[in-house]
Amino acid sequence: MAAPHLCADGSCCSHPSAVPGVQQTLEEMDFDRGIWSAALNGDLGRVKYFIQKATDPSQPDSAGYTALHYASRNGHYAVCQFLLESGAKCDAQTHGGATALHRASYCGHTEIARLLLSHGSNPWLVDNDGMTSLHKAAEKGHEDICSLLLQHSPALKAVRDRKARLACDLLPCNSGLWDLLAS
């Protein structure tokens, strides 16, 4: 609620004092001031600060995303590496079932996907749509990540999502991935 201010005639009224559209909810303020925003923006110094202040590296925000989800999605390798070394759970799932590997795979961050796999991330986990990280990489045509995931777990290409689709069924038109995923 806006703070009352004095009108020109001296009476007290309740006019909004904030600029319309420039308000933040408490939830948004928590995000901006927390480890999630630092990870999203690749601010390793702030992420280290939060961890040194005993912030749980796997603490989820209101949507279930952890700092590792945000760093993975945005390609911040050093932040991902630090979070994993600080005990972040690589397979934490959002309310929609996404893992950091899902996010890195969808966004095309091959080296982060490799890092997550080297820390034990499970490529067999599915989101609420039944999609694996391979589905997410294929959907966006990320050949390097598809190859990486199949080197790690070749049988992933036989996994069907909740709509009975294989990863190869999600390939963009004219994708060179057909041979890799459909064979």
Swiss-Prot record:
Origin: domain of life: Eukaryota
Keyword hit for Phosphoprotein: yes
Keyword terms, alphabetized: ANK repeat, Phosphoprotein, Repeat
ANK repeat residue numbers: 30-59, 63-92, 96-125, 129-158
Coiled-coil spans in chain: none
Phosphoserine found at: S153
Family, as annotated: Belongs to the ANKRD39 family.
Protein name per the record: Ankyrin repeat domain-containing protein 39
Annotated organism of origin: Mus musculus
